[in-house]
Regions:
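A short, basic/flexible loop-to-alpha-helix module at the beginning of a structural domain
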Residues: 1-8
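N-terminal Rossmann NAD(P)H-binding glycine-rich loop of SDR-like oxidoreductase domains
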Residues: 9-31
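SDR active-site strand-loop-helix element
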Residues: 14, 38, 71-75, 117-123
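Glycine/Thr-rich phosphate-binding loops of Rossmann-like dinucleotide-binding domains
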Residues: 21, 80-82, 126-128
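Conserved glycine-rich Rossmann-like NAD(P)H-binding loop of the short-chain dehydrogenase/reductase
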Residues: 33-40
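NAD(P)H-binding glycine-rich loop region in Rossmannoid oxidoreductase-like domains
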Residues: 44-102
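Conserved Rossmann-fold NAD(P)-dependent oxidoreductase catalytic core, especially the SDR/UDP-sugar
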Residues: 90, 101-139
Length: 139
């Protein structure tokens, strides 16, 4: 279980294996923060993020006494490159709204409640780029 880092805070991050998430993880570790990462694939997250972060695949594994100072929610199913079907829309909504609701519920059950929840959709990071095709390499 992550404990508050001596020189920083404990931050829970979803979407930590994406482009913005991996950069955020590096920055927060360099700052001295302790990190808890929620990942669908803990093995992949471990390979990408290293051994300095605590990785969980289920929020339920975090006990009520887990100290979390901040939550950063970058999770969400990929938007670009797939057909815009009814099923896809349901997946997109679930991956964003469902995850956000689960994080709010986690915060409510923690003894040490997070001071902030930041929830972001990473596609906005790229800005307006016209008809240019964007992926995680386009910065």
């Amino acid at each position: 279980m992550a404990s508050s880092a001596p020189s920083g805070r404990t931050v829970l991050i979803t979407g930590a294996t994406g482009f913005i998430g991996t950069h955020l993880v590096r920055r927060l570790l360099a700052r001295g923060d302790a990190l808890i990462v929620l990942a669908r694939s803990p093995a992949r997250a471990r390979r990408l993020l290293g051994s300095e972060v605590q990785i969980t695949s289920e929020l339920a594994t975090l006990g009520a006494s887990t100290p979390i100072d901040a939550i950063v929610n970058l999770a969400g199913a990929r938007i670009l490159g797939l057909p815009w079907t009814r099923s896809r829309r349901a997946t997109l909504l679930s991956s964003r709204i469902g995850t956000t609701n689960a994080l709010v519920a986690l915060g409510a059950r923690l003894e040490h409640r997070p001071r902030v929840l930041v929830s972001a959709s990473a596609i906005g990071y790229y800005g307006v780029r016209g008809a240019e095709t964007l992926d995680e390499q386009a910065i």
